[in-house]
């Protein structure tokens, strides 16, 4: 019996140590594209992520895809600035700015992908294992002038309650 408990304890320890830890934290996000100059194809991209402040995992460990074949890690040195602003209701706004120049006019789907979405989202099955993904589309056309994406003026954070009209 003693050998059984030791074996069970040993196996439990091995399983616990080999499992990958995922702390969930991402609630919402957006990508803002702002063309810097009318004479170049250079854009300033702002990636905004809204996170739970109770998590020790920082936002920004994902991949940012410019839609032209260039993909960067948001936490690497290509980010011009990184900022974290504490909001109310245990929510933080995480902001990263990146500059990118496109090679030619065209339509580009710009996206951001990261693991660790927050758990217990009622209208989404298995939200904790569903990666966080946001995208926006920009059209660079010399006849349209400067093309910027819309900017959300109110953070997309709701505190809904099941069964109660919001």
Report the location of each language-model feature.
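Long, compositionally biased, intrinsically disordered segments
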Residues: 21-166
């Amino acid at each position: 019996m003693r050998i059984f408990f030791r074996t069970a304890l040993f196996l439990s320890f091995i399983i616990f140590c080999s499992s990958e830890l995922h702390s969930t934290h991402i609630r919402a996000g957006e990508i803002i594209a702002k063309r810097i100059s009318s004479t170049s194809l250079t854009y300033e991209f702002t990636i905004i992520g809204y996170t739970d402040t109770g998590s020790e995992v920082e936002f920004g460990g994902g991949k940012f895809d410019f839609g032209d074949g260039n993909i960067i890690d948001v936490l690497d040195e290509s980010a011009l600035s990184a900022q974290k602003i504490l909001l109310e209701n245990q929510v933080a706004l995480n902001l990263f700015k990146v500059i990118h120049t496109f090679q030619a006019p065209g339509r580009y789907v710009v996206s951001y992908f990261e693991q660790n979405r927050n758990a217990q989202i009622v209208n989404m099955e298995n939200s904790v294992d569903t990666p966080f993904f946001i995208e926006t589309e920009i059209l660079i056309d010399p006849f349209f002038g400067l093309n910027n994406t819309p900017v959300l003026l109110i953070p997309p954070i709701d505190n809904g309650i099941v069964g109660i009209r919001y």
